[in-house]
Amino acid sequence: MKARRNKKQIPSFRKLIKTSKVKLENKLKNKQFKQQSTLKKYRKEQRKLRQAVKDAVSKKPIPLENPKEKRPGKRIEREEEEEEEALPLDMMDEDDLQLMKDLGQRVSFLTRDLSSSEPVHAKKRKHERIIDKYEKIPRTLQTAPEKELIHLLPIKDKSGIIPQTREKPVTDSNKDEEDQEEERELEEEIIEDPIQELTIEEHLIERKKKLQEKKMHIAALASAILSDPENNIKKLKELRSMLMEQDPDVAVTVRKLVIVSLMELFKDITPSYKIRPLTEAEKSTKTRKETQKLREFEEGLVSQYKFYLENLEQMVKDWKQRKLKKSNVVSLKAYKGLAEVAVKSLCELLVALPHFNFHNNIIVLIVPLMNDMSKLISEMCCEAVKKLFKQDKLGQASLGVIKVISGFVKGRNYEVRPEMLKTFLCLRIKEVEVKKDTEDINKPKKFMTFKEKRKSLSRMQRKWKKAEEKLERELREAEASESTEKKLKLHTETLNIVFVTYFRILKKAQRSPLLPAVLEGLAKFAHLINVEFFDDLLVVLHTLIESGDLSYQESLHCVQTAFHILSGQGDVLNIDPLKFYTHLYKTLFKLHAGATNEGVEIVLQCLDVMLTKRRKQVSQQRALAFIKRLCTLALHVLPNSSIGILATTRILMHTFPKTDLLLDSESQGSGVFLPELDEPEYCNAQNTALWELHALRRHYHPIVQRFAAHLIAGAPSEGSGALKPELSRRSATELFEAYSMAEMTFNPPVESSNPKIKGKFLQGDSFLNEDLNQLIKRYSSEVATESPLDFTKYLKTSLH
């Protein structure tokens, strides 16, 4: 007969890699727990056995019964036989019965057993031997009164079966003390020697020593992996296992160090291509040692990278769920620090390894954290996404992030942080056109004419050239070089998802705090919107403004978006958006020094798009009205806002030269200026003057003074009234940011005052009053004469 084959397979390297250290530790703990349970059970049984032996010595022995003879039929027959045997006792005298009872108490165990035991089955010889052995054991005669017993299961020993009984539990202080002593003995056996209590200084020294050892171990492993990643890939698993550090003194610090170390290691040793899993055919084919070694390295790297990301995800989940582990090594407060380090590592990997495996998994982890309640984590994730958008030239990674963000915003019913949508502003789509004309695309010719072939190359040369082109094409694909067509396709798809998200919010969540971010995004990407949607979009923006539910900043964003749409592909529509000019003219006076400066920046951008870039569509009356209102506004805002507004006024005066009539001081005109009218076309701005510039010449800020004097002189480009190049070459927005007081600093810096000179006492002609000077000279030149002083007359007068 053949030997039975062992069907259990040896676990592969991949399976061993998948076995985490947590599982191994759990198995070890279960094994130790089982051993302790078995030891406790054995000790308990030994204690019960000792108690049973004590009871058996001091108590009446119990007759044995044959367990096989418990059938109801035989039991009835046996009872009948006993009744028949008991019949003659009725015929005996009472004295004889009493005598037999007295003798029965003093009879030997053998006689009592034979008289009371039931007949044994003849075929069961084995049972008879057991009884014989049991009978040979010496017993003591029970003379004490019987106690209530509880029969337990018998114990089989080398000497035979030992009956086990127990008294009915009675409260006995002595026994309780004995049990407590035995329990203490067991605890002392299990518990090791107690750790000596350390002082705070000793504890800190011990912790520092442990931490230094762990740091050296981490550094050694990291150096070995960096020096030779292919041969030391197994050490990556050893380093990752330190993420489960169990020493409560250094657990949190060690885990943070390991997280950062692994993050830097993966950034350094990860190849610049995506590792795909091997097919069955590739696994079955024989390869060289170098290729096999490379495959094992790639497989180990991907698996360890996957486990590392799972560990980071688990740390974030533990912090979000506020759950304590069974080991209780890390406190709830420490979970937040671990989660912050884990999120930071995920953000670094998101930006550094957009081409590598599991990048989409990292995106799925990062996007919900952009909306986290913790401001630090939310800003960290948003900044990482912005960096990814800025450096992503091809657009593959950006498309993945945009898809997840769009789905997340829709799933949360548009109740998310505005910072999530503001990340869209960093997309690199402005450089690429959405659509190209068919005339601009020159399709390559498939065939050459006979003359072209004859002029250019020979047949063999064309063959070599074709092979070179094929090789170059394969190299470009291997190097993942940017393809214009692929880039255009990805950017188009990304932009479609962005606009779908924006239009959903405009349609369903018009009162959402996301509206400013949506309008700002539409303003940036408006030149890429299809012309077919322009009319509908302008109607929606005008409806939002007229509703009155928006703040002045949101209204300004609507105006800015509308003019960005019209400045791009909207030029062909030939639309005069007078209602948007009117709204901006009306909104200007809502800005003041007590409001935020963000509104001023939006106003400067709107004026540039509405007046400067659309100079041909702007009438002179409209330009005059805006210049007059801007100069009035410059009196009510902060210095940096005044500088930006005056710089815009200077540009408008250069763009519309006929507006210099506002600098004339004529007392006559064709009407009366209506400063409170909100219609720029009908406020008669040509009948007023820019008297505000004279007030601004006395402003405390020196740059405001220069701009006011420059505008009063007619904004000349040369001469004494011209501005310095450092002011004239900058745009209004740049000047607004350059002279901002957000950092509580004054630009230009205030000159330090001269130190105070200590005054000296001067005599003689230094006094300005001539009479006082002469009086001092006269008294100083007189000679003092000694005369007795008598104050009695003054005292007498004061007494009376």
Curated annotation (Swiss-Prot):
Coiled-coil residue windows: 451-490
Bias (Basic and acidic residues): 66-78, 160-174
Function: May be required for adipogenesis.
Pfam families reported in the protein's UniProt record: CBF, NOC3p
Classification via PANTHER family: NUCLEOLAR COMPLEX PROTEIN 3 (PTHR14428), NUCLEOLAR COMPLEX PROTEIN 3 HOMOLOG (PTHR14428:SF5)
Name of the protein described by the UniProt record: Nucleolar complex protein 3 homolog
Basic residues bias spans: 40-51
Organism for this UniProt entry: Homo sapiens (Human)
Family: Belongs to the CBF/MAK21 family.
Gene designation: NOC3L
Single Gene Ontology BP annotation: DNA replication initiation
Matching InterPro entries: ARM-type_fold, CCAAT-binding_factor, Noc3_N, Nucleolar_cplx-assoc_3
Main location per the UniProt record: nucleus
GO CC field: mitochondrion; nuclear speck; nucleolus; nucleoplasm
Tissue: Expressed in colon, heart, kidney, liver, lung, placenta, skeletal muscle, small intestine, spleen and thymus.
SUPFAM superfamilies attached to this UniProt entry: ARM repeat (SSF48371)
Biased composition (Acidic residues): 79-93, 175-187
Segments for region (Disordered): 27-93, 160-187
Annotated crosslink Glycyl lysine isopeptide (Lys-Gly) (interchain with G-Cter in SUMO2) location: 333
Key word Nucleotide-binding present: no
Transmembrane segments: none
Keyword Nucleus in record: yes
